Amino acid sequence: MTKDEVKKLRMNSPESLQFLNNATKFYNLMMMYRCAIREIQTKLEVLDDEFSVENNRNPISFIKTRIKQPNSIYDKLQKMGYEFTTENIQTYLNDVAGVRIVCAFIDDIYMISDLITQQDDVKVIEIKDYIKNPKSNGYRSYHMIVEIPVFFAKGKTPMRVELQIRTNGMDFWATLEHQLRYKKGIEEMPGYDEISEELLHSARAIIEADNEMQRIKDKIGMFHEI
């Protein structure tokens, strides 16, 4: 239903009441996803604080969160062949709520993943390791879909959240690559294949730097706790 169609509806008509009911359900669901993000973020901040006290460093550089935009949710459901309903959003989409965890070193990524997995109220739905198995464009990150219970006034609801865990270098590359590659019409421009190769080369350079920093950390760790 378009905005113009909504404006033409009388507020007491069946169509307008149905629209308002669906909108209310959608915004309530987005609130629930925001709450799920806060639950995950709190877990991560607790782990980071504990590690800071015990090891005098923070494995997590920073955390970013996001809720998928309504247009993106709609488009994804359409591609999957489902109607835009709150029931279908909860059933078929795992990445409406997203948390990006950026770490200092590669081994911090797997440590954070293990610590989250070990928590008894966290259910791991799916793992995709794009660090050991990078995408063809050079993208590297560790993805997890987790389900956690969120407590509301009417009871407990299991909510799914996508976690993306990566190093500072991986995040730097992924952010800039997204800005460069998704400019409108870039795929039709001359030299696009060369640009793709250059981006892939830069991704390889960054993982080499990440691996080198990990080796240096491991050497220091033989004599000093890190």
Please provide the spans of the model-predicted regions.
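Short aromatic/hydrophobic contact patches that present stacked aromatics
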Residues: G98-V102
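Generic solvent-exposed, charged/amphipathic alpha-helical segments
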Residues: I37, Q41, E45, Y74, ...
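An acidic, glycine-/histidine-flanked metal-binding catalytic module
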Residues: M1-I37, Q41-F51, E162-I226
